[in-house]
Amino acid sequence: MNDTLSNTQQSRETIECDVLIVGAGPAGLSAALKLKLQANDAGKELSIIVLDKGAEPGSHILSGAVMDPRALNELIPDWQERGAPIKQPVTQDKLLLLTNEKCINLPDALIPDNFRNHGNFIVSLGNLIKWLAGQAETSGVDIYAGFSATEILYDQDTNIIGVVTGDMGRHRDGSKKEGFQSGIEILAKYTIFAEGARGSLAKELIKKFHLDTGKAPQSFSIGIKELWEVPSDQSHPGLVIHTTGWPLDKESFGGGFLYHLNDNKIALGLVVGLDYSNPWLSPFQEMQRLKTHPSIRKYIDRGKRIGYGARAINNGGIASMPDPCLPGGLLIGCNAGTLNASRIKGIHTAIKSGMIAADAIFNALLDNRKNDILTEYQTLLRQSWLWQELENGSNFKPWFKKGRVIGFIMTGIEHWLLPRMGIKKIPWRVKNNRPDNITLQPANKSQKKLYDKPDGKLTFDILSSVYLSNTWHDDDQPVHLKISDQNIPISINLDIYGGPEERYCPAGVYEFLQDSETQNMRLQINSQNCIHCKVCDIKDPKQNITWTTPEGGNVPNYTGM
C-alpha cells in the first residue's frame, strides 16, 4: 500500500475524476447513478468512474435472490417501464423445519414477519446488475470493467486520494510478460469502496484506521447456490421456500432456500454460518445432502443443474458494522455490513446505502470539499429507514449462536410476537463475541463426517460444480491466495484441525498432498479453481491466508445467477 504519491511508480498512467467507486454491485452502481442524476439535475459536471474486476458488470456477483424493491423504487421509480429484469413476484412463502427424513411445514399464521415476502420479487442479481450498469452508463457514468483495484493511494496526511489498478501481464514468478501493462493510478476527490462482503481493500482500511474499535467481531456465512432447469410440472413460479434444521447439526447456523423463477428455473442453495465448530464439516457436501431430502428432491429430481457458485455473506448486524467514514472515502453495502440477516436480504439495503453515500458526497462537492471525512454519511444513515431495519434484524444470528432452540424462540418473539403487540423496535441488543476463525474444535475431539459419493444427477462433486461457474484464471500469473507462514498449514491446520481448508473451500482450491521426494505433507493451492467466495480469508484458524485480487477479468462468469 502506498503512503504517498511520491513513490517509484512514475511510469503509471494517471486518470483523475471527481468520484471513484470500487465495485459495480448494487451499492456501487446505485451510488454512481444517484450522484450522476443529482449532478445532471443541478446542471453540474461530475466525473464518476466505477471499477469492477469482472469482465462485465454482473458477471461475478451472486445472490439468492429475493429482492425487496423499496430502495429501487426510490432510485428509479419507473424501473418497470425501463425494462428492469424483475418479472417474478413472490406468490407464496413456505418455512420448512427438516429432520433427516421428515418435514414440518410451519403454518402460515406462525411464519415470522422477517420470512414473509409479500411484495418482493425473485430475481437474478447478475441480470439486475447488468441492467443497472446500463442505466448508470446512460446517465454518464464511466464503468471500467475488467479492472481490479489492488492498492489504495494516500496523500501526505493519510487522506485517501484514489487507488491503483492491478498490473496486467505478469508471470507466476512476478516477472513481466511481453505486452505487460502497468496498473493505472485513478485519483478522486472521494473514493467509495463497494467491494462486497470481506472486500480486500476494506479489510486493509478497517485495520489501518481502526474502524472496528469498540465493535463486535464481524460474523459471516457461506452461501452456496445452484441454478436448476426443471420440467414445467415441477416449476411453481413465485414460490419461496426456506428451510431450517437438517442437514446441519444443532450447533451450526444456517438453512436452505428454493426460489422458483418464472422460466422453469429454480435457484436452490444452502447458507452455513462460518462460526461452525466441527472441522470435518463441508458446506459444499451439506448442500449436496440438502437436495436428497424428499421435500427438496421432489422439485428438482427430473431437472438439470445449469449453474453453480458460492460467496461469503456478512451477517453480524449493526453491532459488527465498522465505522464507514474514512478520510476521503466511504464503505458502503456489504463492505460496510449492511445485509439484513434476519430477512436474508442485502440488495435493497446495499442500494439504499449507496444512495445515502451519494447524498453525502454530492453535498460535500457542492461545498468544494474533497478528501475529508464525510461524517454526515453516518448521520444520514442513522436517520434512514435502512438503519431502523438493520436495528430490528441485528440480533438474528447472535441468537442462533446460542443454539438452534434459543434462536427459534427469540426469532419468534422478535419477529412474530412483538409486532403483534404493537412493538416496532426491539428493545434489546445481542452481540457476536467471537470471530469465525477461532471457533473450530480440534479434529480429534470432533465427530468425523462421512459424505456419500455423488450420483451425478442430483448430487455432484466440486470440480464439475466449479466448471458450471465458468471460472477462468490465467495459470501463469502470480497466485492471488497468499500464505503468510508456510509452516502453519501443516503444523496447525492439518495436524490439529485435520486440514479444514480442504472442506470449507467450495471450489477445491486447497489440497493436502504427500511430497513424492520427502514424503512430507504439503498444501497445494489450485488457485485457478477459485470462485472468489473469500471464505478462506475468513475461516483460516490463524488468519494465515489472505485473498487478493487476481488480474482483472479473471473471475467467475456466472450466467443467470
Stretch-by-stretch model annotation:
Residues 19-49:
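N-terminal Rossmann-like FAD-binding beta1-loop-alpha1 element of flavoenzymes
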Residues 400-457:
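C-terminal auxiliary extensions adjacent to catalytic cores
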Residues 126, 131, 135-296, 356, ...:
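Predominantly flavin-linked oxidoreductase catalytic cores and closely associated redox partners
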Residues 310-341, 465-476, 489-504, 511:
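FAD-binding beta-loop-beta segment adjacent to the flavin cofactor pocket
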Residues 337-343, 359-404, 519, 524, ...:
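Active-site-proximal substrate-binding core of FAD-dependent oxidoreductases
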Residues 495-528, 534-557:
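Iron-sulfur cluster-binding cysteine motifs and their immediate structural context
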Residues 1-16, 173-183:
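A short, basic/flexible loop-to-alpha-helix module at the beginning of a structural domain
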Residues 45, 53-102:
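N-terminal FAD cofactor-binding segment of flavoenzymes
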